[in-house]
Curated annotation (Swiss-Prot):
Source organism of this protein record: Rickettsia felis (strain ATCC VR-1525 / URRWXCal2) (Rickettsia azadi)
This protein's encoding gene: ftsZ
Matches recorded under InterPro entries: Cell_div_FtsZ, Cell_div_FtsZ_CS, FtsZ/CetZ, FtsZ_C, Tub_FtsZ_C, Tubulin/FtsZ-like_C, Tubulin/FtsZ_2-layer-sand-dom, Tubulin/FtsZ_GTPase_sf
One record GO biological process: division septum assembly
PANTHER family in the cross-refs: CELL DIVISION PROTEIN FTSZ-RELATED, MITOCHONDRIAL DIVISION PROTEIN FSZA
Subunit structure: Homodimer. Polymerizes to form a dynamic ring structure in a strictly GTP-dependent manner. Interacts directly with several other division proteins.
Residues given in the record as GTP binding sites: 24-28, 111-113, 142, 146, 190
Name of the molecule in the record: Cell division protein FtsZ
Amino acid sequence: MVLNIKAPENIVLKPTITVFGVGGAGSNAVNNMISANLQGANFVVANTDAQSLEHSLCTNKIQLGVSTTRGLGAGASPEVGALAAQESESEIRSYLENSNMVFITAGMGGGTGTGSAPVIARIAKELGILTVGVVTKPFHFEGGHRMKTADKGLIELQQFVDTLIVIPNQNLFRIANEQTTFADAFKMADDILHAGVRGVTDLMIMPGLINLDFADIKAVMSEMGKAMMGTGEASGEDRAIKAAESAISNPLLDHSSMCGARGVLINITGGSDMTLFEVDNAANRIREEVDNLDANIIFGSTFNPELKGIIRVSVVATGIDADKVPTYKPAIAETTNIVPEETYNEPIVQPTQIEEIPDFNSYSTENIEITDSPINQNFIGNEKELGLHANSFNKSEDDSPKPSFLGKIWGSLRASNNQTLERKNIVVNTLDQDNKESDIHDIPAFLRKKRD
């Protein structure tokens, strides 16, 4: 009897993380991560454009929809992109089967990324893989049609991913300047994906005092909806606080606030000189941003000898409540109910038939007495500026002048209590031709003034 005694195989069990680039934008993001020598992840690119695949640095390539597109691209049609991914479903599934977590990166608004990314996410979910979407939205100069296409693609993609991170390309103008090249600007957006993947892989493969396992990460990111990722590095005085603040204030993300987050993953990495107080300061600074007392906050700390003198803080906040996220609203988008000012219409002048015009020359002016009082010079010529109007004056039976033939045409005006006007008063005393009342004459209407 022969006994075969063998040493047990040393099987290393570790989670497999796959970064899946879809379309032109997704392929470029993967190229940037490969160039940065990102460790701990597998890379796959898929595209309908055969020429783009040839220039990819990734070794795992999928030509989507060979029969559907013949390698010529999706022609900016999401429907064609979806059909191409469905045609290549078996090949996509083979690259995803052994993965525990997948990052799907694509650009929304085109044909391949918008149409194929949701199909790939659906396949990943069917395989029980933790799925994270990291996608970009078009620039404003790309037009409204492309933006609407992107929004539809986001709605479709969100149905199949556990966590979704959206990076509007327009936000690149927040950090770019006149010397920033087009390639460098897109690399800034790709750095968000790079930092997110690195933050997860470092927690699982780097040595540290507080290590996290994949179950911890899954608890924070599974079925959490919209999320934000951020990373920050700092050195010198207060480096821990500065790195934490840089991580939680990413200008490229739409939802760059952690308000209302239901899950938070914190990774603090530094060299051998990182102190306990620095770790405490960085972690507490991030916790201050979370106003949800029931949030699941998972913390890890690792060492990296390459970061001597530097502290790096990576944050993944998931389940962000959109109602609590402060978003920028341009002034032109705000509407205000404007109550129109009250308008006053000029009184309609009804012409009065003049039966007889008196002969003014027949009246004597020898005993006319004229009394002047000061006039408010500010009033003259400024009736419109003062807001005075014919309807602003009130007329009463007691103090109104008696009607005359001119008064019937012009009306009699009396200033309101708030707009009292000192007028020039002309007091005319004449003898009454008919001797009806003492010795006062009957004065013409344009000279008549009621006596006090």
